[in-house]
Amino acid sequence: MTLTLIIAAFLGTLAALLLKPLRASAHCDTMEGPTAQDGLRSLETGDPAPALKWVGPADENELREVFEQALAARDLGPAARSVAERWFIENLVRIHRAGEGAPYSGVQPYGTPVDERVAAADAAIASGDLAPLEGLVPADRWAELQRRFAAALDRKDYDTSDVDAGRAYIETYVSFFKYAEGEDHEHGEHHALAHAQHQH
């Protein structure tokens, strides 16, 4: 029954998304992006914490329910595993995007290109150095970019079992990415406050 419901829900979502034009720029909307990768990590380990940090407290129960159903369905065979994983990732990204006040148009496949500033911001976070973004962000925005970058790095090494600490990191992480992409609003305005606390 669980698998049937998951397949029906997934096919319904897929049909709706096929009617929309694909976009190839949103960081958290790609299978290679951090949101989807954390979702897969949660499914592989059976620990929901990596995925939960991308959604606010108000949406936690919804994601936990989807997570438990996906875990159960994955044990029913290879085909069920693939459908369940995709269904969970679709829901994770959808809920995350809604928390940002952003539209959801599906999860883009592996290999989908992203904005060069997004790729550079990823490299900066990974290396702990803003050098990859040099020349991509206007000089008059550099000081604020440095501030947001420092805030993200300060919260990067958190206890991965602490969902609240993970959310605090994601708030600074996405704020940095949004600014690197040229957007001025704080991530928290759309994500943290929308969920009474806080999670590309």
Regions found by a protein language model. Give the residues of each.
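N-terminal Sec/ER secretory leader and immediately downstream segment
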Residues: 24-89, 94
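Feature marks short, highly hydrophobic, charge-poor N-terminal signal-anchor/signal peptide-like helices
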Residues: 1-8
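A generic short-segment signal for beta-strand/edge and adjacent turn/coil regions
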Residues: 7, 19-20, 101-102
